[in-house]
Amino acid sequence: RRVARGFRGRLRDHMARILLVDDEETVRGFLKRGLEIDGHAVVTANDGSDGLDRLNEADGGFDLMLTDIRMPLMDGIALALAAKRDFPDLTILLMTGFADQRERARGLDAIVTDVLTKPFSLADLRATVKRALAA
């Protein structure tokens, strides 16, 4: 097992390194800008497979991973399971706009900190990220 080497020391300054995974470019851009306003360093990936590549390239060097559930190639749940297996200290948040996907995520309470239901406001996102990073 490898331990995620995040940047928790930055949290005093409200800055974290976040991996954002979503297959919709407009959503990625909007969420990235919103998180950067809070001072977070955000790396994006366009699907679960790309997200896992980014995570491995950084040797787990993220404080938090925020991922959509429904994506091509590898969905967010498969990504969360693989990420937690390799980087057990990684904090994971899921996002979904589908009730059935939210139900699938309920069984992952041991590895997922929270599930955001789309649509959500930027204020909701920022508050959820702040709580997750403080946990």
Named regions from a protein language model:
Residues V21-D22, A45, M65:
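Conserved sequence signature across two-component system core domains
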Residues G29-I37:
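Charged docking surfaces used in two-component/phosphorelay signaling
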Residues A78, R85, F98-L116, A123, ...:
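Alpha4 helix (beta4-alpha4-beta5 surface) of REC/receiver domains from two-component response regulators
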Residues N46-D50, D75-L79:
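Acidic catalytic/metal-coordinating carboxylates
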Residues M71:
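Receiver (REC) domain active-site loop signature in two-component systems and cognate sites
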